[in-house]
Amino acid sequence: MKVRASVKRMCRNCKVIRRNGVVRVICSDARHKQRQKGGK
């Protein structure tokens, strides 16, 4: 899980979603998982 100020899609399988006010990227490639720093 990468924690970044700016989350971006790294491939076409990546999906940007919002869970409990936190922006996340989920993907079939585990290396592409990201979470946005800061939260609320």
From Swiss-Prot:
Q: Does the keyword Transport apply?
A: no
Q: What InterPro entries does this protein map onto?
A: Ribosomal_bL36, Ribosomal_bL36_sp
Q: Which GO terms describe its molecular function?
A: structural constituent of ribosome
Q: Which domain of life is it from?
A: Bacteria
Q: Which residues form a coiled coil?
A: none
Cellular component GO terms, alphabetically? cytoplasm; ribonucleoprotein complex; ribosome
Tell me a GO biological process for this protein: translation
Asked if the record carries the keyword Ribosomal protein, the reply is yes
Record Pfam families: Ribosomal_L36 (PF00444)
Q: Which UniProt keywords apply?
A: Ribonucleoprotein, Ribosomal protein
Q: Which family does it belong to?
A: Belongs to the bacterial ribosomal protein bL36 family.
What is the protein name stated in its UniProt record? Large ribosomal subunit protein bL36
Q: Which organism is it from?
A: Coxiella burnetii (strain RSA 493 / Nine Mile phase I)
Q: What is this protein's gene name?
A: rpmJ
